[in-house]
Amino acid sequence: MAIHIVEEANRCLGCKRAFCQIKGCPVQTPIPQVIDLFKQRRLEEAGELLFQNNPMSAVCSMVCNHSGQCEGSCVQGRKGTPVHFSSIENYISTAYLDRKEWTPAPSCGKQVAVVGSGPAGITVAIKMAQLGCAVTVFEQRPEIGGVLEYGIPEFRLPRSLVQKYRHVMCSLGVRVRPSTTIGGALHIDDLLRDGYDAVFVGTGTWRARKLGIPGESRGNVLFGIDYLVDPTSVAIGQNVAVIGAGNVAMDVARTALRSGARKVTVYARSRHISAIDDEVELTELDGAEIVCGKAICAIDDNGPVFETAIFDEDNNVVGYEGELDHVAADTIVIAASQVPKDKLVLTTGGLETDHRGLLSVDEHGMTTVPGVFAAGDVVNGPLTVVHAVAGAKLAVEGMTSYLGL
């Protein structure tokens, strides 16, 4: 492992105009600088640089779309193989989390509430704590992590890594209130009443988007985002049909295969697969089949019913064949995107959303309620961890300015 990483680091050209950083990375990770520090055996400094730019660096090293971002932008890849920065980043970042001694920053006298402890919430909690704010995180589930803990499968992201962030936050003085839903017994108005100077909302998108087709409420149907929370609680059966073509659909398919399913088929309406290329390849490698051109129109006791798409020369859907395709399946898992839950919006006066239920924010990450900021999936819809971090960093800048820090 270490030899491979050193070899990869030595392949880096140290480009002055580093496309891996400026073009490939949503959070502008200073990749050439990190690799240079690593090559000089200045591991702690490299880890510090990564962490301060992106507290979720260790997570991103495992779940990012590297081939479509940093590694996909590496100039070495034009005529050969790109530098595998993901391996280098993982080595540095996990070592940094294990070895770093964390201490609380001097108090600045401000209190911040963070609602949700997914990647955006953790990023904001850490950043604001480092500025000396007294931070309290409110998490509706027993464990922190959000999608990191309850969405991304263990085989992609070890839970032990996710829980290291609880240690980091607590060591920085962050208080965590698990199993507490804001929008339930407590509302955002209560937080503002109780002296929090700013509130950050990073509650993600945890409500499955229903398809509105007959049979969606049958007992042989699951929603992907709910299934991934606890796959062991469901008898998935031998033959599984997954509806959708995004990352959640791929995670569902791979999880089902690890849960005893013998045949897993992913059905996509179009020929455009929105999931990360690497995840699609791994899904097929694990044994799932991906079938394009199937638009689900109903579900019966035997399985899904599809219309078969007709494509033009540009692979656009231009119509459907007349005959319906009835497919046998023990379980149908719908993984066709998700939207935010509406409890928080319904209990917060003046908090505006768009037509999808996503929170509206300005260029500083502030919502339509003064002092309440938001970022991540609850603003953008379901994207990747690194995009959540990018939004969280913008919100931190906005909160810092708002608080006069």
Q: What role is predicted for each listed range?
A:
Residues 111-136, 250-257:
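N-terminal Rossmann-like FAD-binding beta1-loop-alpha1 element of flavoenzymes
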Residues 134-137, 141-172, 176, 253-297:
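Rossmann-like dinucleotide-binding cores of NAD(P)H-dependent redox enzymes
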Residues 1-106, 111, 159, 201-217, ...:
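Ferredoxin-type iron-sulfur electron-transfer modules and their immediate structural context
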Residues 89-106, 164-184, 207-259, 353-368:
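Glycine-rich dinucleotide-binding loop and its adjacent helix/turn
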Residues 173-193, 231, 293-296, 302-330:
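A structured beta-alpha segment of the ubiquitous adenosine-cofactor-binding alpha/beta core
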Residues 217-238, 314, 319-382:
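FAD-site-proximal beta/loop scaffold in flavoenzymes
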Residues 106, 111-115, 163-213, 297-302, ...:
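Feature captures the FAD/FMN-dependent oxidoreductase FAD-binding
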